[in-house]
Every structure is written in C-alpha cells, then in structure tokens.
Amino acid sequence: SSGFNLYSPTFVRGLRKDELPAMAKAYGRSVNLAREAGFDAVEIHAGHGYLISQFLSPYTNHRKDEYGGSLENRMRFMDMVMEEVMQAAGSDMAVLVKMNMRDGFKGGMEIDETMQVAKRLVQDGAQALVLSGGFVSKAPMYVMRGEMPIKTMTHYMNCWWLKYGVRMAG
C-alpha cells in the first residue's frame, strides 16, 4: 500500500492493479532462470515483510480493491504468483514457500490466518512450507535472534542521522 516506507525514511507508492500480473509473471521467469541454472527446486519468499508478505499482512495491506481487506482478498496476489510459479516449475521441480507463522507485532498476521494461508499454498501446489516469522523492517529481533552486527549493518547507510539513530537505539 502507498504510504511511509518501513525500510527507509521515504514514501512509497503501492503497486497499481494493472502492474500485478507482470509482477507475478516475474516470479515465473525467476523459476525458469533457476531451472536453466540447473536447480531442481525453488523457494518462494512469502514472509518477513517481502512483497507477498506485504499483501498477506493486514498491517501493510491497506488496499481498497480486491487485493485488500479480507484474508481471501489479501491472498489473491499470492495465488497469482503461485499460478505462474507452478506453471514454470512443471511436475519435475519442487516448490517450497517460506511464510510467516506470525508477523511478530500487533496488527500483523497471526497463526489463525496463517493456517488458512498454509492450506491455500498447498492447494496452489507448494510441496513444502518453510515456517518462519517476523518482519525485518518492523521487528528485526523477531527474525534475527542474538547479537546483531549493528555497526556492520549501518556502515553503508547513506543518511547520517538514521545511521547514528540505529547505532544508538539498536
């Protein structure tokens, strides 16, 4: 959805409805590239706040069209992606999907909805689910446990005030 960027102090534009099919087809092209490179399996990342996860999570998906609102609507883009992926994968390439069990914060995906997403992914053709949790932008410690290399992570940040803010607050 359009609004403030969770990853940097900028504003973002939500994908237009007419852009979604091309984005889904890009996933299918990626599967074809993996096949050409000799892989016999692919993992689709639908967790941690990446694109599919942003459609699934009620926290980030504020769309007013048929891709937002109810869980059924929020799963539409995922279904579109999986159709392209499964078509490209054929019957001889395994498809795994990494997905969140919980987003890790109030207003995000919870286990009751996740169970429905998991069932849908199996219906869509996924051979395995890789269960995870958290949003790297919203709850990084939920995703990355233990000590984080803050100085290394901030080394390449362009905004000095963001760099020092992250170093001071973690």
What do the PLM-derived regions correspond to, one by one?
Residues S1-G170:
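Flavin-dependent oxidoreductase catalytic cores
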